């Protein structure tokens, strides 16, 4: 079923998306991703640990399915996520899986072919089978591989949240989720808090203490041989003591009602962690026909994605005006909160070095403040560690790259963009693109070369028509009328001096570190920066150029 779903999804993708998914780079990473998913499966199902969030895991599986579509391997071993968790105890009724509906359109389509549907939170815990004989709890079996699990009966008998004796002497099989009790837990604000791993770890112990046992609850989500009417199932379960099921079950008729409850449970307090909602059709197959596969009568709709798994295509190093080096990760485009993300900052050179991110790695990204893409962590490393042209941080600083020396284009371009921006001279019609064109045309090799450009020199630049040339030249000429204080900002004077300026350039140059320290609000570090700036030979040469050009204050 899932194979068919992925095939349908891929067939609907635009050609450019298919090309990216089936790139040569992807071919090299198929086996690495498959092995990582196998390890995650083993940790999750056998050890009860979640080394990666569910949403990143789901995306990794989806990506692997895409790549297998691109690069089929006839001899590949089928992937069985639950294989390592198989136990020795057979389930009386198999545990089915859940089809994961990707969006509202998929949910709407699913609802359109079903009736008498109910919705519940998708409790983030560990699945179990409960077997009652003559009303007494006889056995609790971990999910395992869905057919065979582990006997957790001894620990289960210590858990107050599990009904030990039913009021009716009935033989009964239930399926549900053991969860860790949380007080007023809001999933959208707090996430999963590793609640599932905690329960799994406790249940896998040889001895479960009373305090830990009291922290475990039970949510029954299936009564395979129960009455046909969903309402009767709920009321009976409540009468027997399984109160969560009725409390957190709602009938729905359409996508609007499904979306309402999904948003409500995501943003309102619950006594457990959850990672989405589950849609149940009241009518289901007879219990003896249940299999470890996705059934037609139930499906999951996960909560909104807060993280995206992204493949790194390249790492570029941007050098800013002050010489700060910022590694930028170029990504295979991914969607996050209805936005397409194709690049993200690694923050600082030091952080990039500590993470050691290379092309071919998979990283987790999220949105800071729901707006700015943010790098979280490396999820999977490529076995091939590509060499990268990492800039030497010792060569770039606040006083480097006033000219187009080797390796200086990035910083010089950043300086010019600052100069023409609102924080500098506020030159109309002049931005980073304009400066880049002028540099590529060979008309600018130094910070102030543009001061003497005229219309004739701009005549041979492709894309510069008469109107553009006239606007650029007029903007450059207007710079000569800017006041001295504005020019100082454009040059990049350290900020502490901008509101404490008295006198012209010569007055400022004459101040040494002690003189700067005497000004209120300027500490030793800033004083040293100011002194170094005004005494730097390159800066003094720029000041002389501005003096000759007749700029105020120089």
UniProtKB/Swiss-Prot annotation:
Keywords: DNA damage, DNA repair, DNA replication, Ligase, NAD. The keyword NAD applies. GO terms for molecular function: DNA ligase (NAD+) activity. The active site is at 122 (n6-amp-lysine intermediate). It catalyses: NAD(+) + (deoxyribonucleotide)n-3'-hydroxyl + 5'-phospho-(deoxyribonucleotide)m = (deoxyribonucleotide)n+m + AMP + beta-nicotinamide D-nucleotide. Its EC number is 6.5.1.2. InterPro entries: DNA_ligase, DNA_ligase_B, DNAligase_adenylation, DNAligase_N, NA-bd_OB-fold, NAD_dep_DNA_ligaseB, NAD_DNA_ligase_OB, RuvA_2-like. Transmembrane segments: none annotated. HAMAP family: DNA_ligase_B (MF_01587). Belongs to the NAD-dependent DNA ligase family. LigB subfamily. Catalyzes the formation of phosphodiester linkages between 5'-phosphoryl and 3'-hydroxyl groups in double-stranded DNA using NAD as a coenzyme and as the energy source for the reaction. This is DNA ligase B.
């Amino acid at each position: 079923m899932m194979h068919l779903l992925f095939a349908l999804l891929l067939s609907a993708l635009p050609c450019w998306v298919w090309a990216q998914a089936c790139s040569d780079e992807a071919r090299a990473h198929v086996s690495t991703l498959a092995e990582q998913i196998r390890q995650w499966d083993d940790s999750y199902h056998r050890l009860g640990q979640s080394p990666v969030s569910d949403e990143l895991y789901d995306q990794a599986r989806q990506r692997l399915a895409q790549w297998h579509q691109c690069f089929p391997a006839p001899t590949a071993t089928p992937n069985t996520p639950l294989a390592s968790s198989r136990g020795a105890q057979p389930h009386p009724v198999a545990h089915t899986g859940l089809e994961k509906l990707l969006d509202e359109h998929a949910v709407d389509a699913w609802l359109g072919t079903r009736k008498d549907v109910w919705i519940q939170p998708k409790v983030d815990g560990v699945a179990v089978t409960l077997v009652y004989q003559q009303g007494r709890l006889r056995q609790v079996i971990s999910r395992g591989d869905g057919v065979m699990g582990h006997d957790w009966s001894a620990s289960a008998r210590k858990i107050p949240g599990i009904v030990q004796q039913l009021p009716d002497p009935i033989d009964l099989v239930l399926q549900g989720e053991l969860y860790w009790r949380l007080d007023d837990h809001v999933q959208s604000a707090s996430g999963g808090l590793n609640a599932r791993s905690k329960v799994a770890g406790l249940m896998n112990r040889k001895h479960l203490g009373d305090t830990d046992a009291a922290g475990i609850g039970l949510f029954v989500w299936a009564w395979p041989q129960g009455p046909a009417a969903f309402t009767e199932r709920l009321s009976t379960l409540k009468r027997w003591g399984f109160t969560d099921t009725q409390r957190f079950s709602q009938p729905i008729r359409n996508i609007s009602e499904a979306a309402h409850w999904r948003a409500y449970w995501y943003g309102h307090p619950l006594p457990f962690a959850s990672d989405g909602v589950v849609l149940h059709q009241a009518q289901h197959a007879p219990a003896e026909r249940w299999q470890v596969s996705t059934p037609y009568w139930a499906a999951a709709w996960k909560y909104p994605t807060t993280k995206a798994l992204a493949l790194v295509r390249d790492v570029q190093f941007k050098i800013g005006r002050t010489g700060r080096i910022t590694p930028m990760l170029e990504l295979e485009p991914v969607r996050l909160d209805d936005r397409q993300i194709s690049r993200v900052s690694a923050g600082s050179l030091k952080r990039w070095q500590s993470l050691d991110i290379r092309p071919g790695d998979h990283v987790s990204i999220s949105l800071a403040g729901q707006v700015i893409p943010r790098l979280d962590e490396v999820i999977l490393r490529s076995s091939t560690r590509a060499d990268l042209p990492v800039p030497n941080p010792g060569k770039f600083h606040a006083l480097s790259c006033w000219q187009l020396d080797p390796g200086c284009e990035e910083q010089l371009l950043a300086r010019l963009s600052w100069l023409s921006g609102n924080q500098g001279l506020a030159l109309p019609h002049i931005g980073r693109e304009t400066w880049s064109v002028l540099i590529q045309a060979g008309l600018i090799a130094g910070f102030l070369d543009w001061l003497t450009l005229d219309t004739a020199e701009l005549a041979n630049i492709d894309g510069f028509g008469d109107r553009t040339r006239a606007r650029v030249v007029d903007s450059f000429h207007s710079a000569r009328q800017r006041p001295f204080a504005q020019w100082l900002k454009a040059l990049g004077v350290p900020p502490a001096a901008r509101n404490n300026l008295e006198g012209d350039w010569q007055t400022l140059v004459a101040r040494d570190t002690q003189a700067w320290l005497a000004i209120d609000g300027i500490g030793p570090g800033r004083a040293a920066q100011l002194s170094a700036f005004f005494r730097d030979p390159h800066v003094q040469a720029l000041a002389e150029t501005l003096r000759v050009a007749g700029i105020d204050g120089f």
